[in-house]
């Protein structure tokens, strides 16, 4: 039995799941009720009638906080393999982890000094 024969099962499963998905999608689309009235076409805003435009502008500080969150979230992602293999780490691994943490800490202190996190 070759490698190509083993992939036949995967292709059959993929074809069946794709066909079933397409059939169910079109079945739901053609059987749904298509009654459009004014209340159904309005946007839902916490049970109240919508007032104002939903596409308002955001303050730039929200974006800065989001970027900082992404940076430190990635830091945790990069530090996870170190924490899992801490018993078998060498001196080089420890030094690389320490340099990585120092660079991120310096960046965080720089953000605080520049006032990127001040909301006043």
Curated annotation (Swiss-Prot):
Catalysis performed (reactions): a ubiquinone + NADH + 5 H(+)(in) = a ubiquinol + NAD(+) + 4 H(+)(out)
Topological category with respect to the lipid bilayer: Multi-pass membrane protein
Source organism, top-level taxon: Eukaryota
InterPro entries, per database record: NAD(P)H_OxRDtase_bac/plastid, NADH_UbQ/plastoQ_OxRdtase_su3, NDAH_ubi_oxred_su3_sf
Cellular component annotations (GO), alphabetically ordered: mitochondrial membrane; respiratory chain complex I
Membrane spanning stretches: 7-27, 62-82, 89-109
Location within or outside the cell: Mitochondrion membrane
EC class (word): translocase
PANTHER family to which the protein is assigned, alphabetical: NADH-UBIQUINONE OXIDOREDUCTASE CHAIN 3
Name used for this protein in its record: NADH-ubiquinone oxidoreductase chain 3
Provenance organism: Dictyostelium discoideum (Social amoeba)
